[in-house]
């Protein structure tokens, strides 16, 4: 929201309040569920149970105390399920305030609102554009639906929004640029530590730093360090179940100097994923429908890039969005 009669802090408060009302109304209108009727411990999604219990353990004990896995198995104390420890320590920041059975949900609301505010601050969206933005994510459904769960996805949505907002602020020449640059680096590092493929978000500080050699070098070092850090964390503190989230076969081949074997491993992984994608779409599954929606959004964005380029209009953010999406 934007008003010339209100100070900046008051506008941010109004924006946060409006965004919160939007999220709550959407959940009630679409699913007929109010916030007070959500009880995460009774969720049918096993991931929600794992995540909620681990957040509680991190806030209370500092590390998980072992969780019930498949076939009545247990994890070692200090081991984390799915993606390693970084995500749960990030959730523990608001989790120190938001306690109780639905703490994960309240943390999701906190992160999404924080990401929304960063995005609005950097892009300077007025209330009309924010309303259009809200309609867009409501149409996608998942970005709002997952907020009211114990799933990690809302944190990733928030990190992407915050990175975009800070990058936009830097590009338009915001005040206190040094502090904003530091925050952008911290967010990109945090996103990468949460999930390795989020390293692609370093594209934004990289293109903003170009062609200054020191700035580019610092960005590359930050990206490499955070990517290596998340692999180490997952190797040391990750308790896999049924499957490993990250296949390090190609990396291990590279470390042993087997470049052709590494390339072949990546090729067959991509080929298998592409074949599975085609099967999901052909069978009309929910996953296949989501991929069709993604492809439709990519085509729309590509068409906008071509249109803007042909009419000599800015294409910077659309090109970055395309590259990031394709890499992920």
PLM features: what roles do these ranges have?
Residues 18-20, 132-137, 183-188, 297, ...:
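Transmembrane alpha-helix segments characteristic
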Residues 31-36, 47-77, 86:
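Extracytosolic helix-loop segments that constitute the early lumenal/periplasmic catalytic or substrate-binding loops
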Residues 78-114, 288-293:
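Loop-to-helix entry region of an early transmembrane alpha helix in multi-pass inner-membrane enzymes
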Residues 112-120, 275-316, 325-327:
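Hydrophobic, aromatic-rich transmembrane alpha-helices
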Residues 117-121, 155-174, 180-188:
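Specific aromatic-rich, kink-prone transmembrane helix
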Residues 145-156:
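Short acidic/glycine- and proline-prone juxtamembrane loop motifs at membrane-interface regions
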Residues 166-173, 179, 200-227:
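Perimembrane helix-loop-helix junctions
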Residues 214-300:
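Membrane-lumen/periplasm interface segments of specific transmembrane helices
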């Amino acid at each position: 929201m934007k008003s010339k009669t209100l100070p900046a802090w008051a506008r941010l408060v109004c924006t946060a309040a409006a965004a919160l009302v939007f999220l709550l109304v959407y959940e009630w209108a679409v699913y007929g569920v109010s916030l007070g009727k959500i009880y995460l411990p009774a969720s049918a999604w096993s991931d929600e149970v794992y995540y909620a219990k681990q957040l509680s353990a991190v806030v209370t004990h500092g590390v998980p105390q072992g969780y019930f896995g498949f076939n009545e198995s247990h994890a070692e104390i200090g081991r984390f399920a799915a993606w390693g420890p970084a995500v749960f320590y990030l959730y523990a920041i608001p989790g120190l305030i938001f306690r109780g059975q639905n703490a994960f949900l309240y943390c999701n609301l906190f992160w999404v609102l924080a990401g929304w505010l960063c995005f609005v601050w950097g892009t300077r969206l007025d209330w009309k554009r924010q309303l259009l933005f809200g309609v867009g994510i409501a149409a996608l459904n998942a970005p709002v639906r997952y907020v009211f769960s114990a799933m990690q996805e809302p944190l990733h949505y928030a990190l992407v929004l915050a990175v975009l907002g800070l990058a936009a602020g830097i590009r338009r020449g915001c005040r206190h640029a040094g502090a904003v640059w530091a925050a952008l680096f911290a967010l990109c590092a945090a996103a990468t530590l949460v999930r390795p493929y989020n390293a692609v978000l370093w594209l934004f500080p990289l293109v903003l730093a170009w062609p200054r050699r020191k700035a580019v070098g610092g960005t590359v070092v930050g990206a490499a360090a955070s990517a290596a850090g998340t692999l180490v964390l997952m190797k040391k503190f990750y308790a896999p179940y049924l499957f490993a989230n990250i296949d390090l076969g190609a990396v291990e081949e590279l470390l042993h100097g087997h470049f052709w074997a590494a390339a072949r491993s990546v090729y067959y992984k991509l080929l298998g994923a592409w074949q599975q994608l085609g099967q999901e779409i052909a069978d009309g599954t929910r996953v296949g429908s989501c991929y069709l929606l993604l492809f439709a959004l990519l085509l729309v964005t590509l068409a906008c890039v071509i249109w803007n380029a042909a009419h000599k209009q800015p294409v910077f953010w659309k090109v970055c969005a395309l590259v990031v999406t394709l890499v992920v």
